[in-house]
């Protein structure tokens, strides 16, 4: 089956359509890459938020607990004999 000659604008054997499909594929790949980079940025933001909201306060609380529970070493010169 041949394509009607009256509807043929440029006889390039499908070159224009091939170029359009390649450009469409390149645009889709670029958009996918941008979306992937934005997802990675979102993961970084969530990681930093979790660190500032959870990890740092828990570390401060643990340091306060360690300071509170610190038992000084026995020093026989300071011992009181009753």
Swiss-Prot record:
Transmembrane segments: 20-40
Subcellular location, principal: host cell
Domain of life: Viruses
UniProt topology in membrane: Single-pass type III membrane protein
Virion surface side: 1-19
Residue intervals annotated with topology Intravirion: 41-82
Alphabetical keyword list: Apoptosis, Host Golgi apparatus, Host membrane, Membrane, Transmembrane, Transmembrane helix
A cellular-component GO term for this protein: membrane
Compartments, record wording: Host Golgi apparatus membrane
Disulfide topology: none
Signal peptide limits: none
GO biological process terms held by the UniProt record: disruption of cellular anatomical structure in another organism; viral budding from Golgi membrane
HAMAP family for the chain: ALPHA_CORONA_E
Subunit structure: Homopentamer. Interacts with membrane protein M in the budding compartment of the host cell, which is located between endoplasmic reticulum and the Golgi complex. Interacts with Nucleoprotein.
Family, similarity comment: Belongs to the alphacoronaviruses E protein family.
Physiological role: Plays a central role in virus morphogenesis and assembly. Acts as a viroporin and self-assembles in host membranes forming pentameric protein-lipid pores that allow ion transport. Also plays a role in the induction of apoptosis.
Protein name: Envelope small membrane protein
Gene name in the database record: E
